[in-house]
C-alpha cells in the first residue's frame, strides 16, 4: 500500500487571504481559536510557511510569535509544532532531546529508528545548517555504551539498498543472531548492531522469519531477554520499523495515550511529523492492531481546541 498523509495542499490556496483571516482572529479582545485551528489544519506545511511570509509582509508581525502570545497550553504547543517547516521538525526535536540537563532517549530512539536512510541524511544536513554542530557528535556526547553505538550506526545511513535477496546470507545472519544471543552465555551486542544497522529492509524481514524457524522465537522475544534499558528499546524500535514503520508509529501513539495521563509531546510529534507522510497508513495499522481507532482514542484522551485540532489532523474515523 502506498503511503499517504492526511494533510495535503489546500486547493485554491490564497496565502494573503489566509494571513488576513489569522490576523483578524487574533486582533483585539479575545482570540478566535476555531478560525485558527480550522485554517491551519487544512493547509499543508509549505502553505503555512507561505501564510507566515504574507503575514509578515502585510502586518510586519511574526505569525508564530503572535500565535504564541494568543494561545496557551497543549493547543499552543501543537499549533507551534505545525508551523515549524517540515524539513526542520525532526532536527528540532532531536536537538531538544539532546539539549540541557537530561537526554530524552525516547525521542532519539523513535526518530532515529523510524526514519529511512534518505530521511536521516537530510536530517543530519539540516541539523548542521540550523545548529552549527554535527548531529552524530552531539549524540555521542550525550549517550553511551551499545545504545550510543547503535544510534551512530543508524545515523551513518548506510543501510544496504533493497536488491535481490541472497538466501545464503539470510541464513548466515539468522544463525549469527541466534549464536550471538540465545546460544551464548551473555550477549554479543555488536552482532545485533551490525546486522540490524546495515542490512537492507527486505533482507532483514527475511532474516526475522528465518530466525523464528531456526530458534523458535520471535526476534523481539530474544531482544527482550538478551538486552535491557535504552539499547533494548532501540533494538525493538528498529525491528518494528523494519517490519512496518506505520505499525511502529501506531503503537507509539497507542502507548502515548494508554493508561493514566497522556504523553502529549509524543502525540504532537508523531501526528505533526507524519501528517503529510503516512498518517493515513498509521491510522489503518492502529485500527488493525488495537481495539479502537486513533480518532476515538484521541477523542477520549484530549479536550478543547487541542482535541479539535488533533482530530482534524487525524483526518477521520476508521470504523
Swiss-Prot record:
Residues where Phosphoserine is found: 35
N6-succinyllysine found at: 288
BP terms from Gene Ontology: blood coagulation; negative regulation of coagulation
Keywords, alphabetical: Acetylation, Annexin, Blood coagulation, Calcium, Calcium/phospholipid-binding, Hemostasis, Isopeptide bond, Phosphoprotein, Repeat, S-nitrosylation, Ubl conjugation
Name this protein carries in UniProt: Annexin A5
Modified residues (N6-acetyllysine): 68, 74, 77, 95, 99
Motif segment ([IL]-x-C-x-x-[DE] motif): 312-318
Domains as described in the record: A pair of annexin repeats may form one binding site for calcium and phospholipid. The [IL]-x-C-x-x-[DE] motif is a proposed target motif for cysteine S-nitrosylation mediated by the iNOS-S100A8/A9 transnitrosylase complex.
Entry-linked Gene3D superfamilies: Annexin (1.10.220.10)
Residues in cross-link Glycyl lysine isopeptide (Lys-Gly) (interchain with G-Cter in SUMO1): 27
Post-translational modification as stated in the protein's UniProt record: S-nitrosylation is induced by interferon-gamma and oxidatively-modified low-densitity lipoprotein (LDL(ox)) possibly implicating the iNOS-S100A8/9 transnitrosylase complex.
GO terms of molecular function: calcium ion binding; calcium-dependent phospholipid binding; phosphatidylserine binding
Annexin repeats: 13-84, 85-156, 168-240, 244-315
Xref: SMART domains: ANX
Keyword flag Repeat: yes
GO CC annotation: collagen-containing extracellular matrix; endothelial microparticle; external side of plasma membrane
Lineage: Eukaryota, Metazoa, Chordata, Craniata, Vertebrata
Recorded name of the encoding gene: Anxa5
Modified residues (N-acetylalanine): 2
Protein task: This protein is an anticoagulant protein that acts as an indirect inhibitor of the thromboplastin-specific complex, which is involved in the blood coagulation cascade.
Subunit organization: Monomer. Binds ATRX and EIF5B.
UniProt source species: Mus musculus (Mouse)
InterPro entries, A to Z: Annexin, Annexin_repeat, Annexin_repeat_CS, Annexin_sf, ANX5
Record cross-link Glycyl lysine isopeptide (Lys-Gly) (interchain with G-Cter in SUMO2), residues: 27
Amino acid at each position: 500500500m502506498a503511503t499517504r498523509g492526511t494533510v495535503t495542499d489546500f486547493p485554491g490556496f490564497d496565502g494573503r487571504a489566509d494571513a488576513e483571516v489569522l490576523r483578524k482572529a487574533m486582533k483585539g479582545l479575545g482570540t478566535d481559536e476555531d478560525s485558527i485551528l480550522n485554517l491551519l489544519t487544512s493547509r499543508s506545511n509549505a502553505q503555512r510557511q507561505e501564510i507566515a511570509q504574507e503575514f509578515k509582509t502585510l502586518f510586519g508581525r511574526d505569525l508564530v510569535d503572535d500565535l504564541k502570545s494568543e494561545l496557551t497550553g497543549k493547543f499552543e504547543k501543537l499549533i507551534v509544532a505545525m508551523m515549524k517547516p517540515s524539513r526542520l521538525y525532526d532536527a528540532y526535536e532531536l536537538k531538544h532531546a539532546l539539549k540541557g540537563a537530561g537526554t530524552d532517549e525516547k525521542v532519539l530512539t523513535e526518530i532515529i529508528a523510524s526514519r529511512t536512510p534518505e530521511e536521516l541524511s537530510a536530517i543530519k544536513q539540516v541539523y548542521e545548517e540550523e545548529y552549527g554542530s554535527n548531529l552524530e557528535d552531539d549524540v555521542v556526547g550525550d549517550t553511551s555504551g551499545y545504545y550510543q553505538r547503535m544510534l551512530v550506526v543508524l545515523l551513518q545511513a548506510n543501510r544496504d539498498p533493497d536488491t535481490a535477496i541472497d538466501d545464503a546470507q539470510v541464513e548466515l545472519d539468522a544463525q549469527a543472531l541466534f549464536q550471538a544471543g540465545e546460544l551464548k552465555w551473555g550477549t554479543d551486542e555488536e552482532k545485533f548492531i551490525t546486522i540490524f544497522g546495515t542490512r537492507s529492509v527486505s533482507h532483514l524481514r527475511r532474516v526475522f522469519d528465518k530466525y523464528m524457524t531456526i530458534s523458535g522465537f520471535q526476534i523481539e522475544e530474544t531482544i527482550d531477554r538478551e538486552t535491557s534499558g535504552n539499547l533494548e528499546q532501540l533494538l525493538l524500535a528498529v525491528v518494528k520499523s523494519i517490519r512496518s514503520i506505520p505499525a511502529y508509529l501506531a503503537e507509539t501513539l497507542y502507548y502515548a495515550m494508554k493508561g493514566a495521563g497522556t504523553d502529549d509531546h509524543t502525540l504532537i510529534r508523531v501526528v505533526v511529523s507524519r501528517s503529510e507522510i503516512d498518517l493515513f497508513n498509521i491510522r489503518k495499522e492502529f485500527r488493525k492492531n488495537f481495539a479502537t481507532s486513533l480518532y476515538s482514542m484521541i477523542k477520549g484522551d484530549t479536550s478543547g481546541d487541542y482535541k479539535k485540532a488533533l482530530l482534524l489532523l487525524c483526518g477521520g474515523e476508521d470504523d
